[in-house]
Amino acid sequence: MAPKLQAQFDAVKVLNDTQSKFEMVQILDENGNVVNEDLVPDLTDEQLVELMERMVWTRILDQRSISLNRQGRLGFYAPTAGQEASQLASQYALEKEDYILPGYRDVPQIIWHGLPLTEAFLFSRGHFKGNQFPEGVNALSPQIIIGAQYIQTAGVAFALKKRGKNAVAITYTGDGGSSQGDFYEGINFAAAYKAPAIFVIQNNNYAISTPRSKQTAAETLAQKAIAVGIPGIQVDGMDALAVYQATKEARDRAVAGEGPTLIETMTYRYGPHTMAGDDPTRYRTSDEDAEWEKKDPLVRFRKFLENKGLWNEDKENEVIERAKADIKAAIKEADNTEKQTVTSLMEIMYEDMPQNLAEQYEIYKEKESK
């Protein structure tokens, strides 16, 4: 009698079947043509133009910030060119009452959420006023510890739910951040309590210089949502419409009490990781850069709007000049901001200083008065 064949669980097939379901969602192709009519968001012509204006303005801000950094007039700076659709189209899907918990590359989102540009410059300089956001700007200071913002976002979203607020908390990290323990802890907590959170992974292919292929065996980062039981979606991060629609749907789910969503945006940063000495030519090829430049989010969205008769060179030049004027005024205001002192730092840290610090405070106060 022939032996009975032993059945197998075939866990590999289950994995492959699961990973194959995460296909990148796209609405606009590289030439600005609509390839998925059913998913085109319900945005007015005025809103489409406004989103483009923000993207152009932010590209100029990035160029000027790099220049200001090289002049020694800005401190820490993480370039954003290439990621405008991923950053700004997602922010555009938010409401004023929503909270943004940014990473250090995500300053543009909080600027468009209400943070004055001057304060963004002061944050870069390490001035304490750059961390004192005005009342009504629902955002935390950019998180420097990679991935830590995911835990904070879970907490903020949970608080919004407990308080009965019709709002969400959204956060951003890069592909490298999704390899951090805080990433999993944050999405797991938010999932367990159905907190109104949106978790965005801006997959720009490199964690500083480490390619995504050396960070994880997962075919997509969106599929990491499955482990905690929440929806995950991968979208073309160079496609403003796709990013907007994915974020809008995630927000609708969240405020309806259906819990968080994980969004992976496939994007690319054209510049270095930060201006602190990173040289991308050591780990990226010029051919790779050229391929991604063909997918430029501004070029793509510009073509889309031009085809609709909503955009032209004159309009773009107006935005560019306005951006330059805004930046010039903001950096001048930052230059004229009173320099921080030891006593000013102590004053904002304590309402009632311990005796030993109060004594030190008086010593520094006397020194600073001379």
Swiss-Prot record:
Under Pfam families, the record lists:
E1_dh
Described purpose of this protein according to its UniProt entry: The pyruvate dehydrogenase complex catalyzes the overall conversion of pyruvate to acetyl-CoA and CO(2). It contains multiple copies of three enzymatic components: pyruvate dehydrogenase (E1), dihydrolipoamide acetyltransferase (E2) and lipoamide dehydrogenase (E3).
Quaternary structure, from the entry: Heterodimer of an alpha and a beta chain.
**Is this entry keyworded Isomerase?**
no
For this chain, the annotated S-S bridges are none
Looking at its record, which EC class is this enzyme? oxidoreductase
InterPro entries in alphabetical order: Alpha-ketoacid_DH_E1_comp (IPR050771), DH_E1 (IPR001017), PdhA/BkdA (IPR017596), THDP-binding (IPR029061)
Q: Give the protein's cofactors.
A: thiamine diphosphate
Q: Which GO terms describe its molecular function?
A: pyruvate dehydrogenase (acetyl-transferring) activity
Please list the GO biological process terms of this entry. Answer: branched-chain amino acid catabolic process
Q: Which SUPFAM superfamilies match?
A: Thiamin diphosphate-binding fold (THDP-binding) (SSF52518)
Report keywords, A-Z.
Answer: Oxidoreductase, Pyruvate, Thiamine pyrophosphate
Question: Which reactions are catalysed by this chain?
Answer: N(6)-[(R)-lipoyl]-L-lysyl-[protein] + pyruvate + H(+) = N(6)-[(R)-S(8)-acetyldihydrolipoyl]-L-lysyl-[protein] + CO2
Give the protein name, as stated in the record. Pyruvate dehydrogenase E1 component subunit alpha
